[in-house]
């Protein structure tokens, strides 16, 4: 969320200290979260000044509005820090692609299979593209057999998200990692 700036000063998402106007009294919460009760706005500001922290309006729509005595700078910092942590914990799932041909040799097949296993263990989806050239289009059953072999070899690592289907001269299958 971007905070608007007015004359060099940022407008906070919550009203603080003298910005809280138009209400005669507020429901006040102390620094440690203890409920102080309903007090006049002036008394609440005096208590915040004595503690050397800010009076922050938490819930402006309540009757009377709820305010808390807290260090507002620290509050914003903690809020930004927790938002950053949340963003860091989110993992972007990528789709990794491996290309096969109907005549892929056994050694090449094993290397590509190891790469597929690595992608799936990292939590990424795997897109397997089987490309047909020239007269290979007449033997699509060989390609489908290869895709079925890949599917059975990766049974313990992946589930098939989209089954093999032909798109032009390619057969495509998408695998998703199994949930642990």
From Swiss-Prot:
InterPro entries: T_IF-3_C_sf, T_IF-3_N_sf, Translation_initiation_fac3_CS, Translation_initiation_fac_3, Translation_initiation_fac_3_C, Translation_initiation_fac_3_N. This is Translation initiation factor IF-3. One of its GO terms (cellular component) is cytosol. Pfam families: IF3_C, IF3_N. The gene is infC. Keywords: Cytoplasm, Initiation factor, Protein biosynthesis. Monomer. It is found in: Cytoplasm.
């Amino acid at each position: 969320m971007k905070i608007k700036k007015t004359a060099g000063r940022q407008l906070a998402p919550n009203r603080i200290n003298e910005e809280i106007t138009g209400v005669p009294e507020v429901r006040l919460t102390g620094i440690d979260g203890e409920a102080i009760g309903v007090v006049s706005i002036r008394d609440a500001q005096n208590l915040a000044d004595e503690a050397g922290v800010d009076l922050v309006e938490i819930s402006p729509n309540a009757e009377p509005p709820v305010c808390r005595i807290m260090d507002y700078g620290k509050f914003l910092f903690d809020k930004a820090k927790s938002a950053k942590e949340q963003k860091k914990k989110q993992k972007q799932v990528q789709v990794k692609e491996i290309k096969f041909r109907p005549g892929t040799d056994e050694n090449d097949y094993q290397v590509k299979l190891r790469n597929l296993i690595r992608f799936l263990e990292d939590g990424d989806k795997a897109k397997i593209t089987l490309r047909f050239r020239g007269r290979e289009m007449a033997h699509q059953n060989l390609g489908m057999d290869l895709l079925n072999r890949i599917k059975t070899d990766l049974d313990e690592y992946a589930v098939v998200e989209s089954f093999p289907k032909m798109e032009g001269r390619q057969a495509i299958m998408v695998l998703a990692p199994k949930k642990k």
